[in-house]
Each structure stands twice: as C-alpha cells, then as structure tokens.
C-alpha cells in the first residue's frame, strides 16, 4: 500500500472522508483541505475514477521538516525517483507554499527539480525533461512553515474537469463543489430536483450522474497514474470497463426528475450541450424561466430546489440581487409548499432576503470566497396566507416610515419646482446612515462608511434592509437603484472612475437640461444642494460676463448661459469634467465663441488671468493637496488670498457668489474690508427644502465691492 493525500476545498474534508470510506478506504483521516489514507493500486484507481469531491489525489513519497532550500533538495534527491517514472517521461513541479527561507514558489520548484534530475544522473540514467505544457508526470509539493509534503499526482488535470463542460455560463461552479452542494442539499436521489437559476447546468448534471450511479471520471481520456512505473494497465482497463457499463445501465434506471430554468436562452443551450456530453440529457428538462416568477412544474411533488443564485462582489450590483432574492423567497413560499430548498451564496445578507428560517447550514468555499449553504423546509400555506405574509411585513419600520414622510413632503415640492433631482433622505436616523437621491426614474443610495466600532456584518445587514425598504416604499425597479459608498476623498480620487457602465441620464432643473452619470464616478455630475444657488446665478446673469471657477461639470455655467449671460468662462482642472460641461452647454443650445472653457489649476489660473467679469461663481474644495496642484489649499486659511485675486477680475458693480463646504467656516470680514469688499451670508437663502435638515451642507456668500 502507498500513502495518499486527497486534495479538496476547505469545508469539504469530512464529506470527502465519508465518500472515500464508501469507496472501500479504511482509516481515512481528514486534514486541512484534504484527506490522508493508504490504498492499493486498485483502490486508488477506483478513487480517482469515482470521487466526486476530490480535486486530485497525490501519492505521498515523503513528509519532512523543511527549514531551507538544502532540506528541500536533500529530501527530494533521497527519494528513488527511478521507481516512480522512467527517464523518458516529461515532468513538471507544482509547488505550493512558502516559508521564511523559501520565499518564492518558483525557487522551491527549481530545487525540487534539481533533486529529481540529480537522482537519475547518479544512477547513470538520462535526465528527464521538464514540460510545463504537456507533462507526463506532475510532482506535487505542499509547504507550510517548516513542514513539507512531496509526492506524485495520480490525476493530471484537476478532477473537476469531468469532460462535459468545455464552456460555462456566468460565474460557473466547479463540478466538485457542485457535487458537495448536491450531497448536502437534503436530496435523497429519488425526489424531483429543480434548479431555478441553473446557468450551465452543473448542479443538475452532477445530481443526475449521482442518480445514475455514473462515475464522474468516466469521460476522462488521460490520467497521471498511467505514466507511473507501477501502472497496471489490465487492472485499470477492467475498472474502467465496469464503470462504462454501469453508466449506460444506470441512466435507464433513474426515476428522479430534474428541472433546470434560466432566463438566458444562450446559457440554457450551453446547459443542454453539457448534459448531452455528460450522457444525462434525457434525464433533465431545461426551459427558460425567471426565478422571481417561477411556478411549480408538473410532476414536482415533495421535491427539492437547489440553486446557486448570483452573489455579485461589486457593490453596485447589490440592489438588483436584493430584489432577486426577495422575490425568489416569496415565490418559493407561494409555489413550493411541502418542498425543501437549499441555496448556496457568499452573502448571508442576501440569503436573509429570502425571509426563510434555515433547518441546516454549512460553510464551503467557492475558490477563495467563503460561502454559506442553507437548507430550508417550505411550509404548506394557502395563497392568501403567503400573499398576506409578504405584503404586510414592513422592512425596517422606522426607516420606511421616515422615507414615506419625506417623499410625501419633498416629492410634492419637487414637482411644483419642476425638479427631476432631489434628496429624499439624508441620514435622518443615525442607525440608517445613508443619503438617498432621486434622479428622474432612478434612485442613488449613498452609504456613508460605517464607524469602525460597528461590526461589518451588522452594517451589511442594515444596508440590505435600507435597499429593500427603499424598493418597497418607492416602488422603483431594482435595476434602477444605484449604490455608492462615500468615504473621505484624497487627492484626485474624485476624478477616478468607479466602473465602466458609461450610461448617462438627461435631467431637468428649473428648465435647464443637464447630464448626469449615476454609475461611473462617486459623484453624479450634479451637486443637488446647490440647485437654488444655480437658479439664482441664472437670474443674476442677464447681459453679464460670467466666470465659473472649480466648475466641475459646468451646471452653474449652463444656468447662467440660459439666463442670458453675454459670455461665460468655465475653468476646471479635469478635462473629463470640462468635456462634460461642454456637453451640458450644447444640450441647451449654448454654443459659440462667447462660451470659453479652460483646463487649468484654478488657483494658478487666477494668478495670471486677465479680463473683467460681472458675475463670478467659485465653489472651491475645503482642502486640496493634489499632485496636480503645486501648493496645498485650505479654504479657511486662504480665502482672503483668493478674494484678492478675484477682486482684480471683478467689474465695478459686479458680484462674487462664493461657496464652500467647510463646517464652521468663518469669513474674514476685516480682511475683506481691507480689500474694499463686503460679504453677505446667503446660506439660508440657497438651502433647498430637501437639504433643510442639514443646514451646514454648504455656506454661501455674496461678495461685492464696498461702497
């Protein structure tokens, strides 16, 4: 007998040990990410062919203490490699792990390779060649701290490669993980099994192969052990022949029914092709269908629903997933009473949206991603009971009630003012720390980063409740909800893209058309707290030369131009935002040489600017130390210097509208007086109703020449 290590994923060790025991292995011992055992050639051949859970099997040749590269080389070269494979065979070393002395896996692989070829040379034999592309032999090394395991791989390519799935649908599961999910889903092999989001069909195909008692490796063409010196081809041919006969007979004996649904017809075609290649196409019925509206198919009595719904890691995908899980949970309760369900997901928050209590739950990894599998018993209930349960449950009642109240008050005001964009919630309740903005028929939820003393799981659960409640209260479609996380900005982070959606939306603000982008940047292109400021600038701009500094997307410039400004000059450091400003102007028919755009550091531009303006709007950052700016800027410290440069450009009778977001900003009125300027605080006049709870969102000043 030889010593072996069956390699698997974390969380599957005990399940694999049970499987190996059923395959005739005695004393299978689970270890981290694997199972150790002893086996004869016949036993290991059967394990390789029949294991649904192992990713590979390794014949362990040595376990040793490895403090440095010399330990590694000496232990490797002491093995009689001639007994393992012929010098004509090509090999490769798969080296996993590092320690204090062996810090690079490639270096570790090289030392093992040296030990192997030196063993052959010492026996007067040719050096075997290395082949990374098509090796006959794979040497497996696992190093953790000072412990090393060295052996030869019995499999070749990973055992998850069953041979039936050359291509996959979205986010495919490995076949070994799919088999584990099926084994733990509560299905006994005879009940009907349904996957409402089947993708490329892996869960159903693995289950059908189990029901048919079909060896998962029956379609594989090549095995690592076939290149070993002790390979027994006649024994292997006999074992493989038995499995082939069993596969053909087993399919005909299956009574269980399998149903697969997906809303993507192209992915369904892939699933059907995979089932055909696996030899189980006659057992599975595939059809197009939406999990949110799925109904019980004919013949599905006391069955099991098993599924791996999407669980996007990008935050921006969450609202749609929350709506999907919520609707899916409702449909399970409405249509599948008396059945069982098993759902696999990386997100416990999404699973909570099912609103079902789990009977059992398991932890498994999907690659490096920790996941949960939860099993549910679905109670028999009447349609009226289900409908009442779903419609009467209010999500996050305090938050929902506040949101309803705000929508009633602010929505009425926005319609009267002819505004497409407005805020309906602004962290009104401390425990629900988000801002919610309406942009036409879409909603943006901005989550303020939770304090460090709030557990991450609690913050995630609360955000899930916010999204679900917002969808429930507003009736907005989930695909029209955008989620962002606001954190303290540094340097040029406000200019950096968050994604590549590149969808823009045209909105209306007091008769002015503006372009917003809800997806690609942290900000949308429109600061909603300044809507009244922009309207006022438009009212003041008739026949005047207008200057907009730190202009962002130029929305204030558009208001001034539409209001009848004689000329406009728009200055911003970002070329992206200047182009956006040009698009905003063109959208409103404001084109011509009288409208100038300058890409520049506004502070440097002011130092050298010439010309005179009747109306200047400036909304600088509170603080900036951007690499693209030569010096730092602090609005409290530097606002008098700023006004000194602005006064030089301000015509007699002209006005500066100066705004910033610094809380507790204090205008240096004495410094202004020395410049011959005076300031009037107009902050309250520029605060719109939707920001009335946050009176420090901005401060705004009207600066003019002193009389």
UniProtKB/Swiss-Prot annotation:
Keyword S-adenosyl-L-methionine: yes
CDD domains: AdoMet_MTases, THUMP_AdoMetMT
UniProt entry keywords in alphabetical sequence: Cytoplasm, Methyltransferase, RNA-binding, rRNA processing, S-adenosyl-L-methionine, Transferase
Xref: HAMAP family: 23SrRNA_methyltr_KL
EC id: 2.1.1.173, 2.1.1.264
Gene3D superfamilies named in the record: 3.30.2130.30, RNA methyltransferase domain (HRMD) like, Vaccinia Virus protein VP39
Protein name per UniProt: Ribosomal RNA large subunit methyltransferase K/L
Keyword Ion transport tagged: no
Biological function: Specifically methylates the guanine in position 2445 (m2G2445) and the guanine in position 2069 (m7G2069) of 23S rRNA.
Family: Belongs to the methyltransferase superfamily. RlmKL family.
Catalytic activity: guanosine(2445) in 23S rRNA + S-adenosyl-L-methionine = N(2)-methylguanosine(2445) in 23S rRNA + S-adenosyl-L-homocysteine + H(+); guanosine(2069) in 23S rRNA + S-adenosyl-L-methionine = N(2)-methylguanosine(2069) in 23S rRNA + S-adenosyl-L-homocysteine + H(+)
Gene: rlmL
Pfam families listed in its UniProt record: Methyltrans_SAM, RlmL_1st, THUMP, UPF0020
């Amino acid at each position: 007998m030889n010593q072996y290590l069956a390699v698997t994923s974390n969380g599957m060790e005990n399940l694999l040990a049970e499987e190996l025991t059923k395959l005739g292995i005695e004393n299978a011992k689970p270890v981290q990410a694997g199972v150790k055992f002893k086996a004869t050639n016949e036993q290991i051949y059967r394990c390789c062919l029949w294991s649904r859970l192992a990713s590979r099997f390794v014949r362990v040749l040595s376990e040793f203490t490895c403090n440095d590269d010399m330990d590694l080389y000496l232990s490797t070269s002491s093995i009689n490699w001639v007994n393992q494979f012929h010098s004509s065979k090509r090999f490769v070393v798969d080296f996993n792990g590092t320690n204090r002395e062996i810090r690079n896996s490639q270096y570790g692989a090289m030392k093992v390779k040296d030990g192997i070829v030196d063993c052959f040379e010492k026996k007067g034999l040719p050096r075997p060649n290395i082949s990374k592309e098509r090796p006959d032999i794979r040497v497996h090394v696992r190093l953790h701290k000072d412990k090393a395991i060295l052996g030869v791989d019995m499999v070749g390519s990973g055992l998850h490669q069953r041979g039936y799935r050359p291509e996959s649908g979205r986010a495919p599961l490995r076949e070994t993980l799919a088999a584990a999910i099926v084994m733990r889903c509560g299905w006994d092999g005879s009940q009907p099994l349904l996957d409402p989001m089947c993708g490329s069909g892996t869960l159903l195909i693995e289950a059908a192969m189990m029901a048919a008692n079909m060896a998962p490796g029956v379609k594989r063409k090549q095995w690592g052990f076939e290149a070993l010196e002790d390979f027994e081809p006649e024994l292997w041919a006999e074992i493989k022949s038995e499995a082939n006969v069993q596969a053909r007979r087993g399919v005909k004996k299956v009574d269980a029914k399998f149903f697969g649904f997906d809303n993507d017809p192209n992915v369904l075609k892939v699933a059907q092709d995979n089932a055909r290649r696996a030899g189980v196409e006659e057992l599975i019925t595939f059809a197009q269908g939406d999990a949110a509206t799925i109904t019980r198919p004919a013949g599905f009595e006391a069955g099991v629903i098993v599924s791996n719904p999407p669980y996007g890691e990008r935050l921006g995908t969450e609202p749609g997933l929350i709506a999907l899980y919520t609707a899916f949970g409702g449909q399970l309760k409405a249509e599948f009473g008396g059945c069982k369900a098993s759902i696999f997901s990386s997100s416990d928050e999404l699973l909570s949206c099912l609103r079902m209590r789990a009977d059992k739950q398991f932890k498994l990894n999907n690659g490096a991603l920790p996941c949960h599998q939860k099993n549910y018993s679905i109670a028999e209930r009447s349609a009226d009971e289900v409908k009442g349960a779903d419609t009467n449950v209010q999500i996050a009642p305090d938050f929902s009630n506040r949101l309803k109240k705000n929508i009633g008050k602010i929505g009425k005001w926005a319609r009267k003012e002819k505004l497409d964009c407005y805020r309906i919630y602004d962290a009104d309740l401390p425990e629900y720390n988000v801002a919610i903005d309406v942009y036409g028929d879409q909603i943006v939820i901005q989550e303020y980063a939770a304090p460090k003393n709030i557990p991450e799981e609690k913050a995630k659960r609360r955000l899930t409740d916010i999204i679900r409640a917002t969808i429930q209260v507003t009736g907005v479609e989930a695909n029209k909800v955008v989620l962002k996380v606001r954190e303290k900005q540094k340097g040029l982070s406000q200019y950096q893209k968050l994604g590549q959606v590149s969808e823009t939306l045209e909105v209306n603000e007091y008769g002015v058309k503006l372009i917003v982008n809800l997806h690609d940047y942290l900000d949308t292109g429109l600061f909603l707290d300044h809507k009244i400021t922009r309207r006022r600038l438009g009212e003041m701009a008739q026949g005047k030369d207008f200057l907009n500094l730190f202009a962002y997307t130029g929305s204030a410039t558009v208001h001034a131009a539409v209001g009848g400004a004689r000329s406009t000059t728009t200055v911003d450091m970002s070329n992206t935002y200047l182009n956006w400003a040009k698009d905003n102007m063109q959208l409103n028919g404001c084109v011509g040489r009288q409208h100038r755009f300058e890409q520049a550091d506004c502070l440097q531009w002011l130092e050298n600017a010439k010309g005179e303006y009747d109306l200047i709007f400036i909304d600088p950052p509170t603080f900036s130390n951007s690499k693209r700016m030569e010096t730092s800027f602090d609005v409290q410290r530097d606002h008098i210097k700023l006004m000194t440069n602005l006064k030089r450009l301000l015509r007699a009778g002209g006005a500066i509208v100066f705004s910033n977001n610094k809380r507790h900003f204090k205008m240096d009125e004495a410094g202004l007086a020395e410049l011959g300027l005076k300031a009037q605080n107009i902050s309250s006049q520029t605060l719109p109703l939707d920001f009335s709870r946050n009176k420090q969102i901005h401060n705004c000043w009207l600066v003019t020449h002193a009389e």
